[in-house]
């Protein structure tokens, strides 16, 4: 053979490897959005003047898995507020991660609940910034931890860990880059802050 070419798609990136007698070349490009994904991104209920960091046309698999999109790729009306909330959160913390020069970003999501923020931050850091990251979600409710583990498995996110633990006694790892929490009920906000001081 004169040349072998392997092309594969990993979430939002198309990777092409070319092997010749001269060596190996690798090219990466953003995956072209499908017509279905483009239609979902053009939803008139979204803020058309806003530049979304978690774009519906690029993150459709993730947004479908966490329940923001329908099976056919349309933004659910009752999830538009949640989508705006998590995207705005990413917008607020993005500069911190864009400037981080560590080998690996480690996020700890306290009182992670359904893990919307864990999954979206993982997507943003890994797929948009192309950085190595590890995400740890902690919640006291076993059923939400089980579901988060199942979603991570379905998405192929092997860098995510979900732990069922009480934040009052949970001992976080020492190499945490940032502690995050979307919102917490009752005293969970206080517990998340307490956990952050121990990380």
Region locations from a protein language model:
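Conserved SAM-binding loop of SAM-dependent methyltransferases across substrates and taxa
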Residues: 114-130
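Conserved Class I S-adenosyl-L-methionine-dependent methyltransferase catalytic core
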Residues: 9-105
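A short, conserved alpha-helix within the catalytic core of class I
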Residues: 186-198
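S-adenosyl-L-methionine
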Residues: 143-176
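Short SAM/SAH-binding signature in class I
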Residues: 176-182
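Conserved class I S-adenosyl-L-methionine
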Residues: 103-113
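Conserved SAM-binding motif I beta-strand of class I
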Residues: 133-139
């Amino acid at each position: 053979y004169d040349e072998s070419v392997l092309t594969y798609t990993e979430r939002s990136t198309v990777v092409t490897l070319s092997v010749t007698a001269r060596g190996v070349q690798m090219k990466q490009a953003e995956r072209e959005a499908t017509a279905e994904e483009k239609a979902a991104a053009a939803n008139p209920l979204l803020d058309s003047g806003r530049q979304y960091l978690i774009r519906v046309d690029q993150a459709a698999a993730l947004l479908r898995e966490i329940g923001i999109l329908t099976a056919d790729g349309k933004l659910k009306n009752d999830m538009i507020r949640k989508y705006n909330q998590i995207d705005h959160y990413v917008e607020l913390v993005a500069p911190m991660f864009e400037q981080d020069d560590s080998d690996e970003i480690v996020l700890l999501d306290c009182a992670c609940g359904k893990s919307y923020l864990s999954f979206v931050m993982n997507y943003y850091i890994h797929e948009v910034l192309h950085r190595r990251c590890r995400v740890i979600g902690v919640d006291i409710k076993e059923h939400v931890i089980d579901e988060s583990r199942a979603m991570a498995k379905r998405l192929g996110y092997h860098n995510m860990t979900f732990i069922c633990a009480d934040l009052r006694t949970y001992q976080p790892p020492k190499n945490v880059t940032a502690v995050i929490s979307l919102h917490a009920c009752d005293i969970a906000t206080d517990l998340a802050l307490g956990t952050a001081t121990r990380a």
